[in-house]
């Protein structure tokens, strides 16, 4: 008699083989040998979220599964998945669910896909966006250092497919750094998107602790700077996690570095440790402190600063652009990088 039981779930930190035959580490970090079990401190009350559920949540979940799509909502254990999916929105993760990098804050599986790509993904993604009746879609992806251009051509093909199928949909692309390759960056920026994002993740001092060695603080700044210089009308965006040991002064210095290269939008959120194998939370940042930092960021000239304990780079991204039902407000200009305001798309999302 054959065994019809469900396969045993893979434990965090263990090696496993994906459906595509890729060997990967579950949740991105190998299991740590520890003499004593790690004790997780209770989260503050402001970090409690409702369990996901509801008909709209199930519909989005079904749509994602039927079109073989990966979502950063699932792969990164995002605390906002229930809210976003229940509102009929999702952030789609391109180029599979296995990342070639292993950042110590991230719960995405890590391994070497050895060039694997789903060639039907551009059309499947475009069809899924249409079926979900989205007005604003955030695309992100794993890092693909195994591909010659870091996956830029495939990424751009996905954006073009969405625009060809549903030209009214606003596209935000949260991309890898493409190892700083200018041609790869331009390929994505020229694909028809409205917002180009690359996350700095943390302050300069902590970058080597938090991110994969192949990433870099200056590298991310140069990627964002080149994207803005190449196509000034495209909005640039980045995200910073708090609670990793950064100081207030370092946060403000990071804001200054970002404004110096013309970054338009900044998101600030609380770092949450996804598994015991990842970096520990150093402190809980209060909603009041996030509000204070948002005010400072706006004073420094960001078009918008989305800040809060549960804010993630793609959390309710469409709302960032709702400015009194009039579309986008122009950011303060950076000397030498002034942009004709008429070139900035007015995204009325009502």
Curated annotation (Swiss-Prot):
Q: Name one GO cellular component term.
A: cytoplasm
Q: Which UniProt keywords apply?
A: 4Fe-4S, Cytoplasm, Iron, Iron-sulfur, Metal-binding, S-adenosyl-L-methionine, Transferase
Q: Which SUPFAM superfamilies match?
A: Radical SAM enzymes (SSF102114)
Names of the cofactor(s): [4Fe-4S] cluster
Q: Where in the cell is it found?
A: Cytoplasm
Q: Which PROSITE patterns match?
A: RADICAL_SAM
Q: Which residues form the Radical SAM core domain?
A: 85-303
Record keyword S-adenosyl-L-methionine present:
yes
One family from Pfam that matches here is Radical_SAM
Q: What is its EC number?
A: 2.8.1.8
Q: Which amino acid positions bind [4Fe-4S] cluster 2, per UniProt?
A: 99, 103, 106
Q: Does the keyword Cytoplasm apply?
A: yes
Q: Known NCBIfam families for this protein?
A: lipA (TIGR00510), PRK05481.1 (NF004019), PRK12928.1 (NF009544)
Q: Which family does it belong to?
A: Belongs to the radical SAM superfamily. Lipoyl synthase family.
Its name, as the record gives it, is Lipoyl synthase
Task: Provide the gene name from the record.
Answer: lipA
């Amino acid at each position: 008699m054959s065994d019809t039981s469900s396969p045993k779930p893979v434990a965090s930190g263990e090696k496993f083989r994906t459906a595509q035959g890729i060997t990967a580490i579950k949740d991105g970090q190998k299991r740590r040998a520890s003499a004593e079990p790690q004790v997780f401190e209770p989260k503050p009350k402001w970090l409690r979220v409702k369990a996901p559920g509801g008909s709209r949540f199930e519909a989005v979940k079904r749509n994602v599964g039927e079109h073989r799509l990966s979502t950063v909502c699932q792969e990164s254990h995002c605390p906002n998945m229930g809210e976003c999916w229940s509102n009929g929105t999702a952030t789609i993760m391109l180029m599979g669910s296995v990342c070639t990098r292993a950042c110590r804050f991230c719960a995405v599986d890590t391994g070497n896909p050895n060039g694997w790509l789903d060639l039907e993904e551009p059309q499947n993604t475009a069809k899924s966006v249409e079926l979900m009746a989205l007005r604003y879609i955030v695309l992100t992806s794993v890092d693909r250092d195994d591909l010659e251009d870091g996956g830029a051509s495939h990424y751009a093909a996905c954006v073009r497919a969405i625009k060809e199928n549903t030209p009214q949909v606003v596209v935000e692309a949260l991309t890898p750094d493409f190892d700083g390759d200018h041609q790869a960056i331009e390929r994505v920026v020229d694909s028809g998107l409205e917002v180009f994002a690359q996350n700095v993740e943390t302050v300069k001092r902590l970058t080597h602790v938090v991110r994969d060695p192949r990433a870099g603080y200056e590298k991310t700044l140069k990627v964002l700077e080149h994207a803005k210089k190449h196509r000034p009308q495209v909005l640039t965006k980045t995200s910073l996690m708090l609670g990793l040991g950064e100081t207030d002064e370092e946060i403000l210095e990071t804001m200054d570095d970002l404004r110096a290269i013309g970054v338009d939008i900044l998101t600030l959120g609380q770092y949450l440790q996804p598994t015991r194998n990842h970096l520990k939370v150093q402190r809980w940042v209060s909603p009041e402190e996030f509000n204070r930092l948002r005010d400072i960021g706006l004073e420094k000239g960001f078009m918008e600063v989305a800040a809060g304990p549960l804010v993630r780079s793609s959390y309710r991204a469409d709302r960032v652009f709702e400015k009194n039902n009039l579309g986008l407000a122009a950011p303060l200009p950076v000397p030498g990088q002034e942009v004709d305001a008429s070139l900035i798309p007015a995204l009325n999302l009502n």
